[in-house]
Amino acid sequence: MIFLTGVPGFLGTRLMRSLADTHPDASFGLLVQPKFEDTTRQVLDDLDLADRAEVLPGDITEPDLGLGDRYDAIADRITMACHLAAVYDLSIPRDVGWRVNVTGTRHVLDLLD
């Protein structure tokens, strides 16, 4: 499974489309904040990838990525990962940027360790 963060954002969506083209047999696990689940499902439908992707409601700022009991099973299935979830607005408060961009990245790396 190719694990992605950052979908349905601009970069994450384009990377997923590219990976789907270059890895036609791959499946995707998409870590998505619950508030973006519907948008993500629409993107998957638009790209004709709904049958190849599993939407994983979660949050990179949580130690277990919000995956709870599914954490280990998901980690065991990952063959490739691309972490694109981030806050790009430099005017945000420092603590928010740190929590998402630094701590969130650490949590994704922990999943892959």
Annotate each predicted stretch with a short phrase:
Residues 1-84, 94:
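N-terminal Rossmann/SDR dinucleotide-binding element
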Residues 87-88:
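Active-site segment of SDR-like NAD(P)-dependent oxidoreductases
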Residues 92-113:
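NAD(P)-cofactor binding segment of oxidoreductase domains
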